[in-house]
Amino acid sequence: MVNVTEVLASFRLAVNEQIKTAQDHADLLQNKFKLVMYEGGPAGAGSGSVDDMCMAAHRHPDMRGILAEYYEGMRRNGLVSALVHFVSNGKPSKYGNWGLIEASDQDPRFAPKQQGRAYSTPADPPIPHC
């Protein structure tokens, strides 16, 4: 059986793959195009059961660093002009763990994905005409 540590390791690999994919498209940036990330953010579908390791991984404190690394990696390479999350608030299910938070009244101390996004946000400029 897979454990939470292994799931988190797979998320870290996925972050590196996504940054690499964005770098592969960097030639578009040279032509004054900007990368807009639509429906971005973590997914990590699981079985939807109570003991689902994927859901546990999304709730794990290490997700803060994984998401911060993702956003910072994209920004560091000049690859993000806008990011549109699939959903900012949503309960995990067998279809994925899309939300940065699971409920609008979730205690931020227990929302590591939201913390990771907030940690990486200060340098983001406002998006004009959006």
Task: Give the label of every model feature segment.
Residues 1-35:
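Noncatalytic carbohydrate-binding groove/subsite architecture in carbohydrate-active enzymes
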Residues 25-28, 69, 73-77:
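Alpha-helical structural signal in soluble globular domains
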Residues 34-38, 81-86:
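Structural recognition of the beta-strand scaffold that forms the well-ordered cores
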Residues 41:
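Catalytic metal-binding/acid-base residues of hydrolase active sites
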Residues 48-69, 73-74, 84-130:
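Aromatic-rich peripheral "rim/lid" segments of glycoside hydrolase catalytic domains that contact
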